[in-house]
Amino acid sequence: MADHDIHIIGGGLAGSEAAWQLAEAGYHVRLSEMRGGGDMTPAHQGDGLAEMVCSNSFRSDDGDSNAVGLLHREMRALGSIIMREADATKVPAGSALAVDRDLFSGGVTRALSEHPNITIVRERIDKLPTEGLTIVATGPLTAASLAESIGAATGKDALAFFDAIAPIVYRDSIDMDIAWMASRWDRVGPIGDGRDYINCPLDKDQYYAFVQGLLDGEKTEFKDWEKDTPYFEGCMPIEVMAERGVETLRFGPMKGVGLDNPRTGRWPYAVVQLRQDNALGTLWNMVGFQTKLKHAEQVRLFRTIPGLEKAEFARLGGLHRNSFIRSPELLDRQLRLKSAPHIRFAGQITGCEGYVESAAIGLVAARFAAAELGGRALPPPPPETALGALLCHITGGADASSYQPMNVNFGLFPPLADDVRKKDRKLGYTQRAGKALAEWMTVAAGVAA
């Protein structure tokens, strides 16, 4: 007889959240994670659970007017370990929720390691289990052997996209006689003071020279089988954005609007922002600067940015290929694989995009599995909630033939009544979601009883 009630494969944000939810519901979990067992992915740097690779940001924490902030709120209400540890390890980031990555991963790892209902096994799983309840949360960097097994079980090749990583700079190597601290419009966040970002200003000539440098810079070459792989729009390499037009960056990650340079009293023509990456404030990441430039080229070009002339880099940018399944075609509304319903999928492998979204789907998958283990059925969260809207997109709301990774956004929610004014719509979505979640939680409590 198995020593566990359910097997979770993958110790990223989705798998960690799923393990916590099931353990808290009283079920024994076997959590398999290949990192720390002799294997590593192309993007991870350590073996901690819930390691954040591309960014330290959970994006906006505004639950009244932002869809991802609403998702934060819903997950907190449902006892999310990911949100608990994010709140415990947050660093100043304006109205966004950003964390110290190492403290965050350490907190999640410690919580799961100490839970009496969770057994963490450092092992690589090469094939989908043929029996026993399972949640596959291996993320976009699933081991090739398991990816082949998934393809065989689904009859479908995995879909893929490219994801990019932004560089991290040592704080003491930034020239603060040129750069300055400020948040856009001096916005004060939950733990900040309206001065949460380091801003490096560029004038018109410097900006155009920088863009030309991006276009001319030597870039990572793709293998033949990678050349038709698209980029994810939400994590686009900065040089690819520059290829879309010389002004693209100035109206994107390098926009100077709302940032008064204290030395000129004016907004800069363009700006490079850096966000605190750890609690000590010693590491800062370049916001929106995901890149596939070769490392030597990154150092040369980024040191042409005013204030970063002597920058020392703790990590340079990079590119990795992410895989996901065609979820709307392959999964039912309970995230079960239609061809093998003892298996659920969760996290980024389902085609949701973003750390929070990944953890949210892990949470929902675990709730469904807990109900099934108890011999009951839990209805999906209503589509009016952020959890439900994201779930609907993954399990049928999207066109399976053109399915691509998606962040949570209000476009996934059912429309509001026509008489709601445009300026009131975001609050309308979030208020409606709050009522719908409360009703669903009442139903869920009855199912768990």
From Swiss-Prot:
The keyword NAD applies. It comes from the Bacteria. InterPro entries: FAD/NAD-bd_sf, MnmG-rel, MnmG-rel_CS, MnmG_N, TrmFO. It is found in: Cytoplasm. Keywords: Cytoplasm, FAD, Flavoprotein, Methyltransferase, NAD, NADP, Transferase, tRNA processing. One of its GO terms (cellular component) is cytosol. Its main location: cytoplasm. Its cofactor is FAD. Coiled coil: none annotated. Pfam families: GIDA. It is an enzyme of class 2 (transferase). GO terms for biological process: tRNA methylation; tRNA wobble uridine modification. GO terms for molecular function: flavin adenine dinucleotide binding; tRNA (uracil(54)-C5)-methyltransferase activity, 5,10-methylenetetrahydrofolate-dependent. FAD binds at G10, G11, G12, L13, A14, G15. It catalyses: uridine(54) in tRNA + (6R)-5,10-methylene-5,6,7,8-tetrahydrofolate + NADH + H(+) = 5-methyluridine(54) in tRNA + (6S)-5,6,7,8-tetrahydrofolate + NAD(+); uridine(54) in tRNA + (6R)-5,10-methylene-5,6,7,8-tetrahydrofolate + NADPH + H(+) = 5-methyluridine(54) in tRNA + (6S)-5,6,7,8-tetrahydrofolate + NADP(+). Its EC number is 2.1.1.74. Belongs to the MnmG family. TrmFO subfamily. Catalyzes the folate-dependent formation of 5-methyl-uridine at position 54 (M-5-U54) in all tRNAs. This is Methylenetetrahydrofolate--tRNA-(uracil-5-)-methyltransferase TrmFO. It comes from Sphingopyxis alaskensis (strain DSM 13593 / LMG 18877 / RB2256).
